[in-house]
C-alpha cells in the first residue's frame, strides 16, 4: 500500500519545498469523501503504479485509507517529470466515471500487407460502480487487414458497465503505410 503525508499548508511555497524533497503533490477526492491534500514520495509512487495489477489501488494518507483510481495527472512539459496527480476515491456501490485502458494482442494480418497498427483510443470512458470496473479492454487484432479497424461497439460488453464513448469511434486499426 502506498503511504503519503497530509499537507497541512497548501501554499505554493509548501508545494515547492515538498517537490524539492522528492514528493509528488496529490489531491484525493470523491463522492461522499472530504477532499484531502497530500503528497507521496515520487519514485515509490511511480514504481507502484507500474507494478499494480488493477485500476483501483489503496493509499494511506495520515491515518485515513482510501481506495483510489488515478483520475488525472500533470507532467512538466520540458522534463516530462510527474508533478501533480488527482486521485478519485471510490466507494462501493456508488457509480463513477472512469477511463479504462485498451490493450491489444496478436499480430494483424495487415502488417504483412504493408500496413501499420494505429491505436486511436488508448482509454475508453465508462460509468460503473467500482466493483464492476474492468481492469482493461483486451482487443484481438489478429484478423485486421489494411484499412480495417475495431470500433467501440465491437468491444467486449461487461455487465453493469456503461461505455460512454460513441459507438462509431475507432479504437484500433491498420492503416496503409505511405
Curated annotation (Swiss-Prot):
TM helices/strands, residue ranges: none
GO biological process per UniProt: translation
Keywords, alphabetical: Ribonucleoprotein, Ribosomal protein, RNA-binding, rRNA-binding
SUPFAM superfamilies to which the protein is assigned, alphabetical: Ribosomal protein L25-like (SSF50715)
Ribosomal protein among keywords: yes
Pfam families xref list: Ribosomal_L25p, Ribosomal_TL5_C
GO terms assigned for molecular function: 5S rRNA binding; structural constituent of ribosome
GO cellular component annotations of the record: cytosolic large ribosomal subunit
Coiled-coil zones: none
Family according to the record: Belongs to the bacterial ribosomal protein bL25 family. CTC subfamily.
UniProt function note: This is one of the proteins that binds to the 5S RNA in the ribosome where it forms part of the central protuberance.
Quaternary context: Part of the 50S ribosomal subunit; part of the 5S rRNA/L5/L18/L25 subcomplex. Contacts the 5S rRNA. Binds to the 5S rRNA independently of L5 and L18.
Annotated HAMAP family: Ribosomal_bL25_CTC
Protein name in the entry: Large ribosomal subunit protein bL25
Species: Helicobacter pylori (strain Shi470)
Encoding gene (name): rplY
